[in-house]
Amino acid sequence: MSAYSPLSAQLDADTDVDVESTRTEGRRKMEWTLQHMPILQELRARFAETKPLAGETIGMAMHVEAKTANLVELLALGGAEVAITGCNPLSTHDDVSAALDSNENVTSYAKRGVDEEAYYDAIEAVVAHEPTITIDDGMDMVYAIHEDHPDLLDTIIGGAEETTTGVHRLRAMDEDDELQYPVFAVNDTPMKRLFDNVHGTGESALATIAMTTNLSYAGKNVVVAGYGYCGKGVAQKAAGQNANVIVTEVEPRRALEAHMEGYEVMPMNEAATRGDVFVTTTGNRDVITQEDFEVMSDGAILANAGHFDVEINLEELSELAIDTYEARDGVQAYELGDGRRLNVLAEGRLVNLAAPIALGHPAEVMDQSFGIQAVCVRELIENKSSYDAGVHNVPDELDREVAEIKLKAEGVDIDSLTQTQSEYLDSWSHGT
C-alpha cells in the first residue's frame, strides 16, 4: 500500500483543523445535493438490495465534491470498496473528501491545493488498492496504470471516462493499440453530453465567472472558443444573459453551425481585439496565445472551461507581463508593459470547479451523468465477457434506463410505440 495518507490522516496531523466538524459540513453538503439527485436515489435503492458490485474494488480520479461523493457512496452501497482522489489540484472540497473518508467502505486521498508531486502521489495511492474497475475524469488514472502498473491490467475488468478530454485521450490511446481494457465513453452518450456538457458547463462556467468577478454579461462581448457541446452551452447561456457572443472554431461544420445559429464567427486573433470575456472550451492547448494577448483590451477576463490548464498559454502571458498580482480571490491580474491588465481566473484551470467559490455543475445535471457512470460499472461486472479492450459507447439500453428514471422522478409521462408502429419501423418493404 502507498505511503501517501488518506485525507483523514492528513487532517488529523493538522492541529488547526477540527476533523469532526469538517466531516459534518461535508456530510451536510452531500445530503443537500442527494435530495436533488433522484436518479442516484433510485439506484441506491436498487444497488443496496442486489449488491451488484460485491467483491469489486473501484479506483476513481474525479472532482471530489458533494455530487461526486453521492456517486461514490452509491458504489459503496452496491458492495464495492472505493478508493478516490481528485482529478484537478484545485477542485476538491476538503470537507466532502473528509466525509467520504469516514465511510468504512471508502478511502479518499483527495485534498485541495496539492502540488503536482502530491497530485500524482495520490493517484498512485489509489492504484495501490489494485482496482478492478476505474472511473476517470481526464484519464490520468488509466494512463498511470498502463504506464507504471502494467501488472494490474489483467485483473481490471474495465472502466468509465467522464469527460471530453479524457475520451479524446482514450481514443488516441486506442488507435495506437495501447488501451488494454474496455472503457465506456460516458461523455459521449446522450444522457451525458446533451445535458451535462450543454446545460451543466454553460450554467456553471458562466455562474462561476460572474460570482468570481462580480461582473455582468449584459452588453459585453463574450468570446467562446470551441463550438462543441460545451461551447454551445456557454454560448447559449451567455446570449441568454444579453451578451454579444463571438465563436471561434477550427472545425468548419461546427463553425457553420454557430454561424447559422446567429453567432459571429471569426478567428481568435480577430476576436481578441473585441472580447471582454473569453471562455475556452476546446480540450486542446494554446487556444489563446501571445499574439492574442497583445491585442486584447485592458481588463479582459480569461477563463477556461476545458479539463486541463493548457488552453490559455500562461507561460507566454507571464513573459509579456511586467507584474502579476491577485486582483480578487481567484483572479490573477497580468499587467503588461503598456499598462493593460489581463485577468485570468482559477489559474487557467477548469473555472467552474477550480475557482475558490466554484461548485461545479448543478446537482440535477450531474445526477444524470453519475447515473450513467453507476449503470456502466454494473454493466461491466455483469457482462464483462461482452467487451474487448478499447473505447466503447454506452449501450443504448443503459442510457434509456437512466432517462426513464429521470422522467418518472420529474412526473413526466410519454407515449410508447404500438406494435404496428414497431413493425413499421423494423420493416423495409413499405414505400410510397
From Swiss-Prot:
Amino acids binding substrate:
137, 162, 192, 196
Q: What is its main location?
A: cytoplasm
Organism, per UniProt?
A: Haloquadratum walsbyi (strain DSM 16790 / HBSQ001)
Functional summary from the UniProt entry: May play a key role in the regulation of the intracellular concentration of adenosylhomocysteine.
What keywords sit in the KW lines?
Cytoplasm, Hydrolase, NAD, One-carbon metabolism
Q: Say yes or no: keyword Ligase present.
A: no
Catalysed reaction(s) here are: S-adenosyl-L-homocysteine + H2O = L-homocysteine + adenosine
What family classification does the UniProt entry report for this protein?
Belongs to the adenosylhomocysteinase family.
Task: Name the chain's protein.
Answer: Adenosylhomocysteinase
Q: How would you classify this enzyme at the top EC level?
A: hydrolase
Free-text cofactor note: Binds 1 NAD(+) per subunit.
Alphabetized CDD domains for the sequence: SAHH
Residue numbers binding NAD(+) = 163-165, 197, 226-231, 249, 284, 305-307, 352
Q: Kindly list the GO molecular function terms attached to this UniProt entry.
A: adenosylhomocysteinase activity
- One GO CC term, this protein: cytosol
Which gene name belongs to this protein?
ahcY
Q: HAMAP family recorded for this chain?
A: AdoHcyase
